[in-house]
Amino acid sequence: MKAGSIALVTAGLVGGLALALSVSGLLGSGTLAAQDAAELARVAGGETERVVPGNAGQVNLSFAPVARAVQPAVVNIFTARVMRQRQQMGAFFSMFESQPRVENSLGSGVIVDGAGLVITNNHVVQGADQILVALADRREYPAKLVFAEPRLDLALLKIDPQGSALPVARLGDSDRAQVGDLVLAIGNPFGVGQTVTQGIVSATARTGIGVSDAQFFIQTDAAINQGNSGGALAALSGEVIGINSAILTGGRDGGSIGLGFAIPSNMVKIFLRGASTGKFVTAWVGVEGEPLTAESAKAAGLDRPTGMLVTAVSAGSPADQAGLKAGDIVYAIDGKEVLDPGALRYRIASQPVGESVTVTIVRRGSAQNLKMNLTAPPENPPRQLTQIPSGSILAGVSIANLSPALAQELGAGLPERGVVVVNVPREAPAARTRFPRPGDIVESVNGQRVASVADVRTALGAAQGQTLFRLNRNGQRVECLYQAPAQFGCRAVA
């Protein structure tokens, strides 16, 4: 990495992060539709007014009470992983068993339940053979992993306090944080011991960080370094509003440059609900959409391209039952601004299944609020996971019918219907050509539209030496031509 370059690193074994989630209130706009939408959103959201320090005495107030309230519930996490090395020195030396190598790493965590439940990042404990949790008061307990969700980069540990009382952190409402709010990042950077750093919420609803799937992150300038992963980002109320997860670094040292990111506490709450049932499920909307352009925003009466343009609504979905229609612009959820499809996914994912939300929309230049009841995504059609047999460039590749449930499992942004590539084994012929890739949607084979696993198998069976595939790869159309026995090429198409 060149000095001064910016690279994303995960915090924990590699790096740390702290951040407070903050969601800014909707801004007033110049056009009537935008003003109406913003007002409806404000009523639904109920923001709390912030005040700046009014005098020197207030400026000099200490953060010590906040630190004392949160620090006891923030723990250090030490992990060990046994790595066995392959013997490469011939038959004679293979008689001697290779010595295992132990890889140690460290991170942080937050106690969220007096029974001994500790939340941390998945990357802190993934693959660990031994986990040790050390409290701020020097008590130490072995821990076991009881639940993990790699898509969120969250994991839940369990320790046995053996009848002793444990300090417990309070999880706050991360949606109430705002840019400029003061926050504290608490963790174990570089293993030096528990450390508190102070900063502000630098940005809210930050997406595209690349650490976990379908998420918003809270950005903060509080100093975060290696070992902070899984630690707390605390508001001045003494509540935890984020879990440290990642940092952006410059140069080779991997240290903090004031760009840290945390998983919002509201998403942590949904994760904990999933842990209690053994399965992480987020609410389903049943819409497809695209970001607003300046042109479409102007046509809708908005003076800026904020919102998601609805392009399709699934029949019988929560969106359909709420009255959403193609062409509507989703402006806010419960008063919280929706910038794009990713923002909508987060706003819905951070709400419990079974709850209802207020959706602020703009329809034909007029703003209105709709009530939407959230349900779990259905497994319809059945996924019919299938491995393609030999005799095709796709031999060994696993495909499945997409459904709302499978789309949620596989990751953000996938459509809720069609045929998706689930797995490409390393030994499969397709792996050598990097075609297809997991997550690709197969739209047609030799010009024949395919809507199910059965359609794909039929089309492949009819192919004679030359096969043209049309794919949807992360929203980009791609055509790939395979000519037996070994000619292959792909190109992007409009």
What do these predicted regions represent?
Residues 395-429, 436-438, 442:
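C-terminal accessory/binding modules appended to enzymatic or scaffolding proteins
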Residues 422-427, 431-474, 483-486:
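C-terminal soluble interaction/assembly domains
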Residues 2-358, 362-395, 400-405, 417, ...:
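Serine-dependent protease modules
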Residues 479-494:
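Short, low-complexity, Pro/Ser/Thr/Gly-rich segments in the mature regions of secreted, periplasmic
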